[in-house]
């Protein structure tokens, strides 16, 4: 029945979009991706996700985003045209045209703008915003730097 749905209103567009999103999510789960709540995960048709990735609620993977094995994404995370290596942890983060190498972490509430590169094991901490910068292997960008930081 879903193969012949028409789109003549915003309501019908939402219904057809939901059908397609379920198909995309089910295909990824069949390939070994874990979704805690598939109804709260949005994956664009061009995103690539390796097996053993865990997607938590409120995740959006847009454009040509790629996620490497054993990474955990979310909750509340939007990645657009972003490359994520193996074993990364990204929570409550927005990343646009960024690259995270293996074992990098971001968040909570990090904003990785275009040109951001987190090298292997690097961390962008809480409330950090980075643009057109490379964070070296094992380096950390904390939310506070200086005398009163802990």
Task: Kindly label every feature range from the protein language model.
Residues 1-40, 45-46, 52, 87:
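Terminal amphipathic alpha-helical/low-complexity segments used for targeting or macromolecular assembly
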